[in-house]
């Protein structure tokens, strides 16, 4: 896929969009053998490559490829799976050392029930979602996945982490 992106970058009317799409694909890494799901993932990267970072994170987090890759499609209220929450915090938004293990556990609970329909559309399976109060990065309430992402985005460290990645990529 990277070779195809390089060809697209070379022939695109919007070189910056394609370069940022490739950049985001190397930050929000996932693998999927389902061709339609990976196309949807790549299109999500492209559609949000130059837009609002919060909308981008929420959209990427809902793609079947990301849900499967980090096992969030198996994240249910009585057995939370921490893979997606951990990667969201460590690799995608804040960086190591800027959250606690308890924050990971609480974020995992907030993302319970996130899944996708056979056609690839996102669905929140409410019967598998933990509706109980959570405390994440010092904020308490009946938090869902979008709330966790919003809290992350309010952290100065998130901006610094992403800006450093972009700077390193371009410079």
Label every PLM stretch briefly.
Residues 1-48, 73:
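N-terminal accessory alpha/beta regions
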Residues 5, 38-171:
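Active-site substrate-binding loop specific to GH73 endo-beta-N-acetylglucosaminidase modules
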């Amino acid at each position: 896929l990277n070779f195809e992106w390089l060809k697209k970058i070379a022939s695109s009317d919007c070189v910056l969009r394609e370069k940022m799409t490739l950049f985001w694909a190397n930050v929000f890494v996932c693998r999927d053998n389902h061709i339609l799901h990976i196309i949807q993932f790549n299109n999500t990267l492209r559609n949000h490559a130059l837009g609002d970072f919060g909308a981008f994170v929420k959209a990427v987090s809902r793609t079947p490829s990301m849900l499967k890759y980090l096992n969030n499609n198996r994240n249910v209220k009585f057995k939370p799976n921490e893979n997606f929450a951990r990667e969201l915090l460590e690799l995608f938004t804040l960086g190591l050392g800027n959250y606690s293990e308890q924050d990971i556990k609480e974020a995992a609970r907030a993302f319970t029930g996130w899944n996708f329909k056979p056609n690839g559309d996102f669905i929140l399976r409410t019967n598998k979602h933990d509706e109980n109060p959570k405390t994440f990065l010092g904020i308490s309430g009946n938090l869902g996945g979008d709330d966790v992402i919003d809290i992350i985005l309010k952290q100065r460290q998130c901006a610094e982490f992403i800006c450093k990645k972009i700077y390193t990529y371009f410079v």
